[in-house]
Amino acid sequence: MILYPSIVDLMEKVDSKYTLCALVAKRARQLVAGDKKLVDIDSDKPVTIATEEVYRGLITYERPQKYGIK
């Protein structure tokens, strides 16, 4: 269970809990693949590192333009 940062604090960084989950998971996979972490924390767990990076605003996302059916 995540205690810090709280889910409420993390939700201020994204538009939905699904986006948060996808963002953290993708970043954690990048860390496992060898990307350098952007925060200096004591944890070696990729999900914890990715969560902290999102919380600090170091990892962001961009929604693609929506194309409707014409």
UniProtKB/Swiss-Prot annotation:
GO terms for cellular component: DNA-directed RNA polymerase complex. Signal peptide: none annotated. Its EC number is 2.7.7.6. It catalyses: RNA(n) + a ribonucleoside 5'-triphosphate = RNA(n+1) + diphosphate. One of its GO terms (molecular function) is DNA-directed RNA polymerase activity. Pfam families: RNA_pol_Rpb6 (PF01192). The keyword Transcription regulation does not apply. The keyword Transferase applies. Keywords: DNA-directed RNA polymerase, Nucleotidyltransferase, Transcription, Transferase. It is an enzyme of class 2 (transferase). InterPro entries: DNA-dir_RNA_pol_omega, Pol_omega/Rpo6/RPB6, RPB6/omega-like_sf. GO terms for biological process: DNA-templated transcription. Belongs to the RNA polymerase subunit omega family. The RNAP catalytic core consists of 2 alpha, 1 beta, 1 beta' and 1 omega subunit. When a sigma factor is associated with the core the holoenzyme is formed, which can initiate transcription. Promotes RNA polymerase assembly. Latches the N- and C-terminal regions of the beta' subunit thereby facilitating its interaction with the beta and alpha subunits. This is DNA-directed RNA polymerase subunit omega. It comes from Caldanaerobacter subterraneus subsp. tengcongensis (strain DSM 15242 / JCM 11007 / NBRC 100824 / MB4) (Thermoanaerobacter tengcongensis). The lineage of its organism: Bacteria, Bacillati, Bacillota, Clostridia, Thermoanaerobacterales. The gene is rpoZ.
